[in-house]
């Protein structure tokens, strides 16, 4: 029987609360789907919690455990008590973790966990119904990692955006793999600013080369990022498929997309360090896209669905358990369809109520 080693970072504020519900899901799979194997969970501190205890947002011990693991599950990090002016900040731990694990591809799905949530969207139901795409953001290159010059009092500052062909090729291959795994294969949308930026022109050329030569059966379309941002509001279904873009553009467009499903608490993410083809280890960091929510943490009202769906992504991409991943997603849909909703969705269910409802539906599905 397989044993899956998972490092768990509860993180700060509401992070541990939502992780508890995600772990309930893993325990249910162990019990009700024995062929999935065992989940060996190792708890470590990250972010502010680690600063408070170790004066370090990510210790060497925690980092080494994450490197050796099959996957990493994270709640959320950060909070006002650690400030933004401090030399040691919670976010430094997550950035270091991403860098050391080489997680170059960030995946954020944009869809409705349940059709009943369409009316929760700020967009009209007839506009957003049927939206289903995944943003694949290059995570370890671009302007966030380029040379910068801080303002030294002269009133001048500078950031540079470097990209190499190799960096673009590997994120294009990841997007191509994900698109090809869909049934039927999904369309690939590549977002850039090739009418202005040199890096975008290299991006467009490289993505075209990779998709046309390595994934000839896929349909590829290029879209300027500003046009795509407008399309996302006007007709988000037009981007259905796999959306690939650079670090900066992906950061912005994925946050814009996160508004569509109606609550940031619903949305999962995965940061991968390889192609999840089942042929070798593909470690990843799995976390909800929401922050640590210090204003509502400890009240039992945080929505754990984003974290639970992050577990589904972990099962699919790092642990090669697609049946169980599908079951978790179906259980979330069933729980919401049956009326279990947290406060952010207009309901009264607690964090624990939501987790328990998903587990109850999951048990039915796995035993069927």
UniProtKB/Swiss-Prot annotation:
Residues at the site labelled Important for catalysis: 144, 193
Role description: Catalyzes the oxidation of 3-carboxy-2-hydroxy-4-methylpentanoate (3-isopropylmalate) to 3-carboxy-4-methyl-2-oxopentanoate. The product decarboxylates to 4-methyl-2 oxopentanoate.
Domain of life: Eukaryota
Binding-site list for Mg(2+): 226, 251, 255
Residues reported in the UniProt entry to bind NAD(+): 79-91, 291-303
GO biological process: glyoxylate cycle; L-leucine biosynthetic process
Name of this chain's protein: 3-isopropylmalate dehydrogenase
Binding site for substrate: 98, 108, 137, 226
Catalysis: reaction(s): (2R,3S)-3-isopropylmalate + NAD(+) = 4-methyl-2-oxopentanoate + CO2 + NADH
Family according to the record: Belongs to the isocitrate and isopropylmalate dehydrogenases family.
Classification via InterPro entries: IsoCit/isopropylmalate_DH_CS, IsoPropMal-DH-like_dom, Isopropylmalate_DH
Keyword Isomerase: no
Main localization, broad class: cytoplasm
Essential cofactor(s): Mg(2+); Mn(2+)
Pathway: Amino-acid biosynthesis; L-leucine biosynthesis; L-leucine from 3-methyl-2-oxobutanoate: step 3/4
Gene name per UniProt: LEU1
NCBIfam families, sorted: leuB
């Amino acid at each position: 029987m397989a044993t899956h080693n998972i490092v768990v970072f509860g993180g700060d504020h509401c992070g541990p609360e939502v992780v508890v519900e995600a772990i309930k899901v893993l325990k249910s799979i162990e019990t009700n789907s024995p062929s999935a194997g065992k989940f060996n969970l190792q708890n470590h501190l990250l972010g502010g919690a680690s600063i408070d205890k170790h004066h370090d947002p990510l210790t060497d011990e925690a980092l080494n455990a994450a490197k050796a693991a099959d996957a990493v599950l994270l709640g959320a990090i950060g909070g006002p008590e650690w400030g933004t002016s401090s030399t040691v900040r919670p976010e430094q731990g997550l950035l270091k973790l991403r860098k050391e694990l080489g997680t170059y591809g960030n995946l954020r799905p944009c869809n409705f966990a349940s059709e009943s949530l369409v009316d929760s969207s700020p967009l009209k139901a007839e506009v957003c119904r049927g939206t289903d795409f995944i943003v694949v953001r290059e995570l370890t290159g671009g302007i966030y990692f380029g040379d910068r010059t801080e303002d030294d009092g002269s009133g001048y500052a500078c950031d540079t955006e470097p990209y190499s062909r190799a960096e673009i090729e590997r994120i294009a291959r990841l997007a191509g793999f994900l698109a090809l795994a869909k049934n039927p294969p999904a369309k690939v949308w590549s977002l850039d600013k090739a009418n202005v930026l040199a890096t975008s022109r290299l991006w467009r050329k490289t993505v075209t080369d990779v998709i046309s030569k390595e994934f000839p059966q896929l349909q590829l379309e290029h879209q300027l990022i500003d046009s795509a941002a407008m399309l996302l509001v006007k007709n988000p279904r037009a981007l259905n498929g796999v959306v690939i873009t650079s670090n900066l553009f992906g950061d912005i467009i994925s946050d814009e997309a996160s508004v569509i499903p109606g609550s940031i608490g619903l949305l999962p993410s995965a940061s991968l360090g390889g192609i999840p083809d089942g042929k070798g280890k593909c470690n990843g960091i799995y976390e909800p896209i929401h922050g640590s929510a210090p204003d509502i943490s400890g009240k039992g009202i945080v929505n754990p669905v984003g974290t639970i769906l992050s577990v589904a992504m972990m099962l699919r991409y790092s642990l090669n358990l697609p049946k169980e991943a599908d079951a978790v997603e179906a259980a979330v849909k069933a729980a919401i369809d049956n009326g279990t909703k947290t406060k952010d969705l207009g309901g009264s269910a607690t964090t624990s109520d939501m987790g328990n409802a998903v587990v109850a539906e999951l048990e039915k599905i796995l035993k069927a």
